[in-house]
């Protein structure tokens, strides 16, 4: 029942427009998180596993972002920003995003990947491998990047096509 109520609260406020919608989302979504500072949430956001997410002050989640942390951990540092359409899926693993990190639109961070060791067995039947993604402070990840488990992006790095 608690999971249902969480999803209901998220869905009910996800598309409320204007500054009033942003305020309502912060006020009513904040208790769902493990920790949530003064964050800003755009419209159309989908989330599951909020109790495993920590968002510091100044975090900005753009419209249409998806955040998942069922059985995993998502930590976002101060002033980290997700542009519209970013997917962060920490389910089963860990994703740690540092301070002042900018992540471009359409980027996907996923703490799980398919196993593909066997040539005889279809990939879809080989299960998943879970791991960590660590993005240190002051990083810019450009649009439409995909970050998979086992990745560490160092302080001040820029990730994107030339």
Map each language-model feature to its residues:
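Terminal amphipathic alpha-helical/low-complexity segments used for targeting or macromolecular assembly
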Residues: 1-38, 100, 106-107, 113-119, ...
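Short histidine/acidic/glycine/proline-rich micro-motifs that form metal-
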Residues: 14-15, 45-47
């Amino acid at each position: 029942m608690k999971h249902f109520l969480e999803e209901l609260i998220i869905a009910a406020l996800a598309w409320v427009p204007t500054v009033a919608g942003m305020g309502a989302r912060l006020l009513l979504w904040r208790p769902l998180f493990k920790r949530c500072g003064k964050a800003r949430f755009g419209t159309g956001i989908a989330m599951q596993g909020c109790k495993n997410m920590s968002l510091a002050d100044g975090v900005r989640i753009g419209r249409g972002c998806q955040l998942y942390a069922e059985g995993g951990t998502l930590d976002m540092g101060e002033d980290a920003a997700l542009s519209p359409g970013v997917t962060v899926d920490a389910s089963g693993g860990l994703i740690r995003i540092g301070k002042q990190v900018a992540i471009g639109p359409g980027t996907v961070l996923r703490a799980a990947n398919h196993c593909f060791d066997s040539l005889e067995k279809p990939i879809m039947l080989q299960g998943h491998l879970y791991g960590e993604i660590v993005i240190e402070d002051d990083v810019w990840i450009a649009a439409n990047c995909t970050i998979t488990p086992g990745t560490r992006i160092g302080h001040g790095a820029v990730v994107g096509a030339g």
